[in-house]
């Protein structure tokens, strides 16, 4: 494996479950990411969410991906996840294009407001730092923009960096493009 550019498994709801992550690790993935999990469900202690979020020793390094759009809930969920699931990083989903996610203001809908993106990351960073997890990397997965009239990945990425994100990954399509080739 050429480690100049690490092979990182992209988080995909309904795909990157524990069995798939183990298979990818076996075949050379350098870094894994869980399926996205709801910050609200984490805060409510949902059992199905706990199963999705569980990371075992054979999956390391592995990030846990959270989605949500309420800064306080995202912050609380980040600390719960750091304590309960001990991920190697926490990734924030600002890229999911699914209508049921976007219609709630989550996923790629967050990109409509760079200020909200900043607030989410800043609150999460503060909560992690205050909870004893200052060494926990906070990363973001986003799209190039919400639609072709709003290509704002650079602006949102800079706001996330200002808020405390250590890394940003850009899916080179807009929400409008969904998964089109």
Question: Model regions: which residues?
Answer:
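Flavin-dependent oxidoreductase catalytic cores
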Residues: 1-181
